[in-house]
Regions:
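A feature for loop-to-transmembrane-helix boundaries and adjacent hydrophobic helices
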Residues: 1-348
Length: 348
């Protein structure tokens, strides 16, 4: 029986503009990063930070995250790149797909921590601001799997089943054309996670990393059941895929962090970025550091001018005093001469 409704897969995942290839997978990642930075910047500014800070820190976090995501994928799926008949160079071809979210978060957090430390910013506060944006970025990035026709689920004939070309089907089911669109499931789930974090943050004023922990916990719940549907090769431990076990452990850690931190450090940070506070104070006073420097220079110049005028006036007074003294001395000498002449005349 042929399905009359299904989700088609793109005929190709790359479009060439002359010698330049435009890959759908990379395009989705780039769009996701821009959305995350844009939303994170708005949320950071709403918390009292500078609008440009999120983008500045992303310059560190994004490259670290991409490297971490690729490393996690290669390590957990090493059989795809190493061994007989495999070319290890393919491990570097990130544009062909293959990023592990846990590696991306771990190494991306390291890059963000380095940048935050350089600016005197708390990493948990920054993570809270960017958490919904990361979820939206994942929602967009998952469509890269659609372009590559990868990471789909089990065979199904549901109306929203995803049609996979024969070249991308599992070797043991080449005659099956439609599968669960797990990329779509995770994309929608991530949108829901982002909205949940935004709502909870407004409702409960989450701070000190708890908004980010909520994002992690909520994401792992969806990742667990979506991972269970996937049919791509993966390592299994006690009957579960490796990423399922990772989801369980990360979920437990995130929930524990929310509970413990809420007791030890309730509330939200009052100051998220010292530089923003300084800028706000300067703005409130109607000055800025550059203007202050200019004013100080002008005041110093005025003082120098006054000192110069004072010295000139003193010099004039001194000259006038000396001239007056000379005049008085001449007058005294003249008077003495007259008296002497008068006495001489009298004696004669």
């Amino acid at each position: 029986m042929e399905l009359i409704a299904f989700i088609p897969s793109p005929s190709r995942g790359v479009i060439h503009l002359g010698p330049i290839p435009l890959r759908g997978y990379a395009f989705c990642i780039i769009i996701g990063v821009f959305v995350a930075v844009w939303l994170g910047g708005r949320r950071w500014a709403a918390r009292g930070g500078l609008k440009t800070t999120v983008a500045d820190i992303a310059v560190w976090a994004v490259p670290f995250g991409l490297v971490g995501g690729r490393l996690y994928h290669v390590i957990t799926s090493y059989e795809l790149y190493f061994g007989e008949g495999k070319d290890w160079v393919n491990a570097f071809k990130i544009w062909e797909g293959g990023l592990g979210i846990w590696g991306a978060i771990a190494l991306g957090a390291l890059g963000a921590w380095i940048a935050c430390r350089r600016r005197g910013i708390s990493l948990p506060a920054y993570a809270d601001a960017v958490a919904p944006g990361i979820a939206f970025a994942q929602a967009i990035g998952r469509w890269g799997n659609w372009f590559n026709q990868e990471l789909y689920g089990r065979a199904t004939d549901l109306p929203w089943a995803l049609k996979i070309d024969s070249a991308h089907r599992p070797a043991d089911s080449l005659d099956v054309a439609t599968y669960h669109p797990t990329f779509l499931y995770e994309s929608l789930w991530c949108v829901g996670v982002a909205l949940l974090v935004i709502w909870a943050d407004r409702r409960f004023s989450l701070g000190r990393g708890r908004a980010f922990a909520l994002y992690v916990a909520a994401y792992t719940v969806g990742r667990f059941w979506i991972e269970y549907l996937r049919v791509d090769d993966a390592h299994h431990v006690l009957g579960l895929r490796l990423n399922d076990w990772t989801s369980i452990l990360v979920f437990a850690a995130a929930v524990a962090y929310i509970v413990v931190s809420a007791k030890l450090r309730p509330g939200r940070e009052e100051v998220v970025e010292p530089a923003a506070v300084a800028a706000a104070d300067a703005s409130a006073q109607g000055t800025d550091p550059d203007a202050k420097d200019t004013k100080d220079a002008k005041d110093a110049k005025d003082v120098d001018a006054k000192d110069a005028d004072g010295h000139a006036a003193d010099a004039k007074k001194t000259e006038a005093g000396e001239a007056e003294s000379d005049q008085n001395r001449d007058e005294e000498d003249g008077a003495a001469a007259v008296d002497a002449g008068a006495k001489t005349a009298k004696n004669l």
